[in-house]
């Protein structure tokens, strides 16, 4: 069974290879309770198709409304990444279903490079761990095969996330 990140990235790579506009959303910061952990990803196609999750529902619905059906759909033509924060106020946290006053910050990447996504998916299919770093100002992406997973890093200039095989532990025996 394919892990969720690979599933999301594979769909995103297919959409981009077919020339479809799309975005990749990554949870880069949370405060308080959050339905999905830092590093969770979701892909949204211009058609409104969604793969993956960043919140469990309401935020995904808002992203669909913003970027596939509404006035901000033009952003899908813009290559500059954006940070988007949900749950800043108690009313907003309630509206988007964020538990216990949680706040969530997303990095939105518009129209990631199709060739880079295909390389990423190929490395993941080969069972490699990959570190993907996005420059928030320029949108430039650097992907490198790495030896071990590292936690997501979000500094003032870059966001770096690791993708790769999931570790499994099997316990076999009686008793």
Q: What do these predicted ranges mean?
A:
Residues 1-175:
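Segments forming oxygen-rich coordination pockets for charged ligands
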């Amino acid at each position: 069974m394919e892990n969720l990140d690979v599933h999301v990235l594979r769909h995103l790579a297919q959409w981009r290879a077919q020339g479809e506009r799309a975005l990749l959303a990554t949870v880069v910061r949370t405060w308080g309770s959050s339905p999905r952990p830092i590093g969770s990803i979701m892909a949204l196609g211009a058609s409104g198709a969604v793969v993956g999750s960043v919140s469990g529902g309401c935020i995904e619905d808002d992203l669909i409304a913003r970027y596939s059906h509404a006035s901000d759909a033009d952003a899908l033509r813009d290559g500059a990444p954006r940070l988007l924060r949900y749950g800043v106020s108690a009313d907003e946290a309630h509206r988007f279903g964020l538990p216990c006053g949680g706040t969530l910050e997303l990095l939105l990447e518009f129209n990631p490079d199709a060739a880079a996504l295909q390389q990423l998916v190929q490395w993941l299919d080969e069972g490699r761990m990959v570190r993907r770093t996005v420059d928030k100002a320029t949108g430039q992406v650097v992907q490198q095969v790495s030896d071990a997973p590292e936690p997501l890093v979000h500094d003032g200039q870059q966001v770096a996330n690791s993708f790769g095989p999931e570790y499994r532990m099997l316990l076999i025996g009686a008793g």
